[in-house]
Amino acid sequence: MLSTKWLAIAASVLVLLAVGCRGPMPVYNVTDAPVAASKPSPSLDEVGKAIQRAGVALGWQMKETKPGHMLGTLVLRTHVAVVDVNYSVKSYSIRYKDSTDLGYDGQNIHPNYNGWVQNLDKGIRAQLSLL
């Protein structure tokens, strides 16, 4: 009985190590995702506001720099992620712009960054579906 307990503990430790030791991964970008709104033709302003709502709800600071472009910044402790969000009435893209303390090497980045961008993408899709 004791050996089964130790085997279970050892297996749990190995799983935690495997999950916790993920190395850098390729940067996740979203390219030309369709604007899937419930109404036929949302305006550029409506698309921008939906993107802004999605980002703010997830803790991103979303700043419109010009019509069709936003700069998204997420600050979590010492980590900073900055993305360009380009959008039109038909599609949007989320692209890596800059980061701090995420180990970006020109191609790869800390895996948490990818999760944050994937969550932003999901949030944008959800907000756009409400238009």
List each model region and its residues.
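Bacterial N-terminal signal peptides that target proteins for export
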Residues: 1-9
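Hydrophobic helical h-region of N-terminal Sec-dependent signal peptides
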Residues: 9-15
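C-terminal motif of bacterial Sec signal peptides marking the signal peptidase cleavage site
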Residues: 17-20
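Ser/Thr-rich, low-complexity intrinsically disordered terminal regions
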Residues: 22-131
